[in-house]
Amino acid sequence: MLAKRIIPCLDVRDGQVVKGVQFRNHEIIGDIVPLAERYAKEGADELVFYDITASSDGRVVDKSWVSRVAEVIDIPFCVAGGIRSVEDAGKILSFGADKISINSPALSDPTLISRLADRYGVQCVVVGIDTWFDEKTGEYLVYQFTGDEKRTQQTPWKTLDWVQEVQQRGAGEIVLNMMNQDGVRQGYDLKQLALVRQVTQVPMIASGGAGEMSHFLDAFKLANVDGALAASVFHKQIININELKQYLAENGVKVRI
């Protein structure tokens, strides 16, 4: 059995790491490179960087910091933000990123997933899915351009349908960003994770809602996710990654220590 992964998420805007609540009201956390170094030293298995306004601004992720991160950390990292072409992805990979992640551009052009997988291999291609639970309909729905409050929009896709679609097109990994839970630290949406897990054959990462160590344990034990992504609990030093891994290991979860 593969070790479960602990993945700090760094939302990037204007060259700094920021964090919001339910994708709104972002506060500045700090500089990108020192935070990346800190998490690598604390025992993170990998890092994910989201340039949160790149897609809504119509630009690709700022590459200047990607190469700096590659120089200072020795763990894998994934970069997302406005990647609309095979060439965009190639540049980011050439600057040292191990994976690229696409979200809104994949919704605009689903063939991008297969083109990226064909060129760089499925192991490099992560698809992020911003999913919102609609209480009126009881459905999980996919949203697009969530980095910009003015442009955020619901798509025609239901989450479970889109999860299956991206796998068929060559996604090597799926990150499920549960918008209702984002930043509120009340726990991952275990019901949604379990539903998605049933239709997911590739590695699946939970994102949105971690507030205490037990939330990670629940995601691994009850929803069988492959990795758990979190931001504010690490940024605000509510949870130490080494201590989290010790806790998980003591509770029967295989992790790298």
From Swiss-Prot:
SUPFAM superfamilies in the record: Ribulose-phoshate binding barrel
Statement: the UniProt record of this protein carries the keyword Lyase: yes
Main location: cytoplasm
Gene Ontology terms: cellular component: cytoplasm
Annotated catalytic residues: 11, 130
Matching InterPro entries: Aldolase_TIM, His_biosynth, HisF, IGPS_HisA/HisF, RibuloseP-bd_barrel
Record's keyword annotation contains Isomerase: no
CDD domains: HisF
A GO term for molecular function: lyase activity
Pathway(s) where this gene product acts: Amino-acid biosynthesis; L-histidine biosynthesis; L-histidine from 5-phospho-alpha-D-ribose 1-diphosphate: step 5/9
EC number(s) given by UniProt: 4.3.2.10
Single biological process term from Gene Ontology: L-histidine biosynthetic process
Subcellular location per the Swiss-Prot or TrEMBL entry: Cytoplasm
Keywords, alphabetical: Amino-acid biosynthesis, Cytoplasm, Histidine biosynthesis, Lyase
Assembly and interaction partners: Heterodimer of HisH and HisF.
Family that this chain belongs to: Belongs to the HisA/HisF family.
Protein name: Imidazole glycerol phosphate synthase subunit HisF
